[in-house]
Amino acid sequence: MKQDLHPKYTKVTVNCANCGNSFETRSTRPSIKVDICNNCHPFYTGKQMLVDTAGRVERFNKRFAKSTAAQAKAQ
């Protein structure tokens, strides 16, 4: 059998970018950074997070109105 075939499996610290929570696990990577963890995820906390979609919907409606106006003008 070949020696040193598998990567080293060591303890690493996982850091959450959202809440700053950190915990230890094992991995082949030197460090792990996650966007959201069990400490701040809405499913685990029971808190609803407001997602800013209103601005996107308004922008879409504005672009859609421009395209329909251009089509009506062309006909």
Curated annotation (Swiss-Prot):
Record bears the keyword Transferase: no
InterPro entries in the cross-refs: Ribosomal_bL28/bL31-like_sf, Ribosomal_bL31, Ribosomal_bL31_A, Ribosomal_bL31_sf
GO biological process: translation
PROSITE patterns associated with the record: RIBOSOMAL_L31
GO molecular function: rRNA binding; structural constituent of ribosome
SUPFAM superfamilies from the UniProt entry: L28p-like (SSF143800)
GO CC terms in record: ribonucleoprotein complex; ribosome
Keyword RNA-binding set for record: yes
Keywords for this protein: Ribonucleoprotein, Ribosomal protein, RNA-binding, rRNA-binding
Domain of life: Bacteria
Chain segments annotated as coiled-coil in the UniProt record: none
One Pfam family linked to the record: Ribosomal_L31
Subunit structure: Part of the 50S ribosomal subunit.
Family assignment from sequence similarity: Belongs to the bacterial ribosomal protein bL31 family. Type A subfamily.
Function: Binds the 23S rRNA.
Protein name: Large ribosomal subunit protein bL31
